[in-house]
A protein has these predicted regions:
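Non-catalytic terminal accessory segments
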Residues: 1-137, 390-402
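N-terminal signal-anchor transmembrane helix
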Residues: 107-118, 122-183
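Soluble catalytic domains of enzymes that build or remodel membrane lipids, polysaccharides, and related
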Residues: 150-396, 401
Length: 402
């Protein structure tokens, strides 16, 4: 898979895949070795009693980590392998314990108490990130006014679903059709990545996705695009989307014209070749009916400069998951966008264009932890209202050079 190998984030994902296939017993030496190493460091710095206490604490939290991670598939919370996140947590815990031992030379009690608190906090965050936050669905509402819309009957409401990453249906997925129906939207759009990469040919995952999409019976106008080519197997997903009555926009546009709105929805298939994808976007913008508000559906936010230069009114994307793990005051730790944190999540203005990057609903695959931290799953509702004023600016037929 060329793209996966070229993107550092996905290179990391590939590296996590192999440990997910290791037998659980093969993991035992690492926490034992780290507990012994940290125990020796504390014994050397503060005495044998502190060393035994540290080694015992690390073994206890390692057992708790494994109990938590291995229980996730049985509880129906998520369905990824436990081995890679367990190894990562064990390594982090060992590093913290050894680092804390360096402070123990000036007095052991306070550093050990702080170290123990951090170790327990990691367990709490792991439980919260895997069992709680992935199910705290947030409905984000955005209001945009445009002189291209009259809206005598009220705003045009669009609901966006992105990055479902289905492995097996969870309680979040089962609640989704009812949540969408309650939003009373005019148009629903899906912006790619329907199955998790490691499940994208799995018969049960495909059947579960079909059940989920079939349940999304409203609104009547439903459109979808493809996500990353390595994730979305179009040959397997096309029949599922079509059976659910969802219209695929594969490098084409569709015009919706009523007495309430005049909309040109463009779907660009994501190849992660920015120059080629931008050229197909230019063609679709050139085909836009005069006076129509243009809505671009593209899986990643990476065409934002081109879309703004071409005068696209609204651009809905996903792909980044908002980072999936965020730090307060900093935001996404890492994103899979070529622009890094520039378009990590949320609403952006580029000239007269609006971009919204959804945090998505699902989580990364391979051996990555099926966890969200300070980055709740998101359903996006955009209300497009008319605005009196100057005539809208004409659209350019040429974006920036790729």
């Amino acid at each position: 898979m060329k793209f996966l190998g070229e993107n550092p984030f996905y290179t990391l994902l590939l590296l996590t895949e192999k440990p997910g296939k290791w037998p659980p017993w093969s993991l035992v030496p690492l926490p034992l070795a780290l507990a012994a190493l940290a125990g020796l460091a504390w014994a050397s710095a503060a005495g044998p009693a502190w060393g035994w206490a540290t080694a015992g604490l690390l073994l206890v939290v390692a057992l708790a980590d494994w109990a938590l991670l291995s229980s996730l598939p049985r509880s129906g919370a998520s369905f990824g392998p436990a081995q890679p996140p367990f190894l990562a947590l064990s390594a982090l815990r060992g590093l913290l314990a050894v680092a804390a031992a360096l402070l123990a030379r000036w007095g052991a009690a306070l550093p050990w108490a702080l170290h123990g608190t951090v170790q327990l906090a990691l367990l709490f965050l792991a439980a919260y990130g895997t069992l709680v936050e992935p199910f705290l669905l947030q409905v984000t509402r955005l209001e945009i006014a445009s002189p291209r819309l009259a809206n005598p009957g009220g705003p045009l409401r669009i609901v966006q679903l992105s990055d479902l990453h289905v492995e097996r249906l969870t309680r979040r997925d089962r609640a989704l059709p009812g949540t969408v129906a309650g939003l009373d939207a005019d148009v629903m759009v899906l912006t790619g990545d329907y199955l998790n990469t490691t499940y994208n040919q799995d018969p049960q995952a495909l059947a579960d996705l079909a059940e989920l999409l079939a349940g999304l019976e409203s609104p009547e106008q439903r459109y979808a695009i493809w996500g990353s080519p390595e994730v979305d197997r179009t040959d397997l997903l096309r029949p599922i989307l079509e059976a659910a009555g969802i219209t695929l926009l594969e490098d084409r546009g569709v015009e919706l014209h009523t007495d309430r709105y005049h909309l040109w929805i463009m779907g660009v298939t994501c190849s992660h070749d920015r120059a080629g994808d931008a050229e197909r976007l230019r063609r679709l913008v050139a085909e836009a009916p005069p006076g129509a508000l243009t809505l671009l559906l593209y899986h990643t936010p990476d065409l934002a400069p081109e879309a703004a230069a071409l005068g696209v009114d609204l651009y809905l994307a996903g792909h980044t998951h908002g980072g999936q793990w965020r730090l307060p005051g900093f935001g996404a730790i890492v994103t899979s966008s070529r622009y890094g944190k520039r378009y990590e999540a949320g609403h952006y203005r580029e000239g007269n264009s609006h971009l919204y990057v959804s945090r998505g609903l699902g989580m990364e695959g391979f051996g990555m932890p099926r966890a969200r931290l300070f980055c709740r799953p998101e359903l996006v509702v955009v209300d497009l209202a008319g605005r009196a004023g100057a005539d809208p600016a004409p659209r350019s037929q040429n974006g920036p050079e790729a």
